[in-house]
Amino acid sequence: APPGNDGVSPQEARWRLSQLLGPNAEARPQQADYASAVSQAFQPREAEDSPNLVLAEAGTGVGKTLGYVAPASVWAQKNQGPVWLSTFTRNLQHQIDTELDRLFPEMRDKQRKVVVRKGRENYLCLLNYEEAVRGLQVRSQDALAVGLMARWTARTRDGDMVGGDFPGWLPDLVGRGRTLGLTDRRGECIYAACPHYRKCFIEGSIRRARRAEIVVANHALVMIQAALGGGDEGTIPPRTVFDEGHHVFDAADSAFSAHLSGRETVELRRWLLGAEGGSRSSSRIRGLKRRVEDLLGDDPEVPEALDETLRAARCLPADGWHGRLTEDAAAGPAERFLASVRQQVYARVTRPGDPYSLETELRPAIQPLVDGAAELDTALEALYRPMKRLHDGLHARLDAEAEDLDSDTRRRIEATCRSLNRRGLMQVGAWRNMLQAAQDAAGPDAFVDWLMVERADGRDIDVGLHRHWVDPTQPFAQFVAQPSQGMVITSATLTDGSGDR
């Protein structure tokens, strides 16, 4: 059931704050005033797309954390819904989690009512761990690392390996490959097809977040969830508090940007086609066909759309693309476009020998780049169309066979549709918009586009076309603020001091 709409009065916020502080706490009127002011964000919304928004600046030492936890916890308990507390840094995320011990002194209650949410790449993947155990037959030297990981896995609160209860000294002792290398890597998750799905740390945190009272997250995750219409959660948090609010727009700038680069396009090809050419990559990078072939149903158009998608995906760069670019031997539309990007960057920068990344403006574009953009746009259209048919065909099966599908199959189809939309349709659509703009003498006013050759230690590692919003508050307002019922943006430094006298 959706959460209720009961508001939180200033008096309730002050009362809860006094409970959290205890009878022997030092009186801090500013903290009580802050909690009272923040409670306005927890009133019922009065108009569509008009959240109750509170901008609250309070200096260091006021006690902001408990100041907003007080009304947030009252709202969550009264309305049976979660409040998301978002931070920019892991340190503050950990601090909030610690402060919540005051609200839930019993660890059993806290584990049920408080969830710390981070991106997938922060959590141990149990299937990766299983593969590491199997690998001991040929790599017995990994036994110590795998054994220590087993002890930690049995006792960890939530499987968080980056800033959670994972011992930071362990990778230095036994190596990263069998420790931090076991996290969920981008694009590998097979969701309900995984034998560990029901015990998965990531899926567990997502499920618990739906039932929790307080979800402690970070700005990047909240932004991406909003941009994806709820993402893995499937819903937009009804109430959100952004602490470290002066970083909100940096986070929005990053979350709502687009990158058409060698690294991004290679990842999409690998996600669609799997490991190619005898790659020694993880056996789980097995391509879209092997992941979904048992989900296609009886409609003959769906397997046909899958085959067309996989054929069209070969327009994307394959392994070894970077060497071919430097040797002027680009193969395929994407590589030819990236080669033209590299050519323009090196032609325009004044110090191409610098060890740092190189950037230049997109316009005026050289003719090979304009031609390459047109060619790649055509190739991506041929990829987008069958991918859309595949997505729609799978989604239609959810409705057509609603009464017959078992829960695991339904979850796998839903996860596949989300992945196709997020990793495929949205990404390819953004790339096509960028390529079409690259062919025009004047780009769209809302965006800034530029070309970059990314370097590490003086060596080129990536090439691409990048797009950011000129004003990232526009997508923030549309995708994050408008769907919300109430929002707090707070920091010690929200204003720039320009009005001071």
For each of these PLM feature ranges, what is it?
Residues 1-18, 49, 60, 79-213, ...:
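A substrate-engagement module of RecA-like helicase motors
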Residues 3-56:
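Conserved pre-motif I regulatory segment
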Residues 39-43, 65-79, 100-103:
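Walker A/P-loop NTP-binding motif
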Residues 47-71:
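Walker A/P-loop
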Residues 180, 185-210, 226-231, 383, ...:
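A contiguous, basic/glycine-rich beta-loop/short-helix subdomain that forms a polymer-engagement track
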Residues 211-224:
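Conserved two-lobed SF2 helicase motor
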Residues 235-256:
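SF2 helicase catalytic motif II
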Residues 249-428, 432:
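"flanking P-loop NTPase cores in genome-maintenance ATPases
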